[in-house]
Amino acid sequence: MTHQDRLHSPALPDGSPFDLDNPAAYPAWREARLAAAPRTLDHLIVEIGDPRHLTEAEHAAILKRCARANMAIYVSTAGEDPDKSIPARLGERFGLCRLDHNRGADEDAITSLMVKDDARHRGYIPYTDRPIAWHTDGYYNDAEHQIHGLILHCVRPAEQGGDNALLDPEIAYIRVRDQGPDLIRALMHPECMTIPANPRELGGDQGGQGHPRPDRPGPVFSVAQDGHLHMRYTDRSRSIRWRDDPLTAAAVACLKSVLREPSPWRFQARLESGWGLICNNVLHTRTAFADGTAPRLLYRARYYDRIRGI
């Protein structure tokens, strides 16, 4: 690692499993992480009553799954209740409070995800019925506004499609690092992945300051101040610029291969009415979908916080 790279790297806590220059802690962390990781979708699911009023047992069950997989799927009795306090109150219970006022969000910073063709949303794929490739949310945000927590709450599913594939970023990290620590080093470079400037996004991701969003370079993998692994990624091929060197190219190819290949830790889920995903911004996709009489509606809440307690 060059001196310049070190200037851009976070100060890692002693004994961090993510310290490539002092890897002693990594093998034990890797073994424990893989041993704890669920291998079936059923192990992510928690049945609950009202998400706005979790019992202590429901809270503990969700937290346990998030500790093992950085995510949980709740199956609630809320049905098609359109109350936006459902994701808001649920998030607060897990320490998710600092909402990201992104460009497409509603006034309360919770986004109503459905097919929209107005000028504000036109051209942005989340508001279409098209498939969305692997990504973490808010990958275009600046370093001070990274998305660490995410809730997706389903009010109405599509008539067909709209499924999500899910993968814990820590599992993706392990599978790439197994192929060589230098690949991880490339993915942790501060200029590994750049999202080019977008003059259409005034103020972009944090509520709008009246300025076009500039280039946003940053790493794919980084370590947050609390010592947790953080991932920033999109599998799209347009509107993205990778660092131009052979090691980065090899690292990106390895990561894309990990995302393409089936594995015991990759899950496929379809959120039904009253169901939701609460997570530490895990990797996810969305299949194409077709609406019926009532359009698909999900609420998306993005947070600058991680889930508290894990």
Where are the language model's segments positioned?
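Short, flexible beta-strand-to-coil junctions
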Residues: 74-81, 154-158
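N-terminal, charged low-complexity regulatory/assembly segments
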Residues: 69-78, 87
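Polybasic, low-complexity association/targeting segments
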Residues: 56-61
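Active-site environment of non-heme Fe oxygenases that use a 2-His-1-carboxylate facial triad
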Residues: 2-54, 65, 106, 111-270, ...
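A short alpha->loop->secondary-structure connector
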Residues: 91-100
